[in-house]
Amino acid sequence: MAENRGVAYMKPGVVEVQSIDFPKLWDPAIKKKIEHGVILKIISTNICGSDQHMVRGRTTAPSGLILGHEITGEVLEVGRDVLFIKKGDVVSVPFNIACGRCRNCKEQNTGICLNTNPERPGSAYGYVDMGGWVGGQAEYVTVPYADWNLLKFPDKEQAMEKILDLTMLSDIFPTGYHGAFTAGVTSGSTVYIAGGGPVGLAAAYSAQLLGAAVVFVGDLIPERLEQARSFGCEPIDVSKGDPQDQIEQLLGVPEVDAAVDAVGFEARGHGSDADHEAPATVLNSIMTVTRAAGKLGMISLDEAPQGYADFDSGAAKEFVLNPPG
């Protein structure tokens, strides 16, 4: 049997590569064999901002938890109940684990599947309180409900040539798209994306795909702002002050139709407050820059601590708030 290694969270600020058990077709929560699953050999895996929350000690993650929920891999072993996925297939793995059979999955709310985590709705690989599934920052990993959860690339050779792009399909791009979509972006929309990291840039590009007329991207880091500019977005340097003033200079009005929070609760302040953490800053600012009856897409809300947002500040505008589904 092949050896397996994974990246384990040990304590705040400390991770280490460990030898771990080779995966089995096994559900760790119900302790039963799962013939609907497969075992993957990992081709690529990414570091998510959510992983960093754990590593920084911002969650109750236990020592020894194997990290990683952004996975692309090659199918090594197939359970006998799997119909459409074959050994040797190259596949993308959505970060949330879903059964495809429960009411929530049938209503397309796969992020809160009722069957993959006995403790609460919703499950994911390598994350605290999300069902006990081993993470994908490893050499091999188990994926349950393979016919439902895996996206097979039709041409293996072409997939390998584009693997650095396709690796974003497991989390980064769909998360950004979900933020733009739930914010109601459509033809002619004006949009503000708070955060120019990978997910924020994916949200900005998704807003363009959805037909936005103007997309603003706010961040503190010049390289991120330049990247946003490179594909047609208007950069907003929040280290220079409030985004609303800069948006008005470019748009002629101080408000947009839709906004997305792609930063989350480890946000920093604007202008002179940019050197320290201010959890409520981003969400409160997108409420300020969005017009009355506009929509907000909040990608990073699930783990937010008390003080993340002052929702009273948005009450007068009657926003449609769309947290992750």
Where are the regions that the model predicts?
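Conserved acidic E/D residue at the C-terminus of a beta-strand in Rossmann-like folds
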Residues: 219-220
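Glycine-rich cofactor phosphate-binding loops and adjacent beta1-alpha1 units
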Residues: 183-185, 210, 226, 231-298
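Short beta-strand element of Class I
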Residues: 213-216
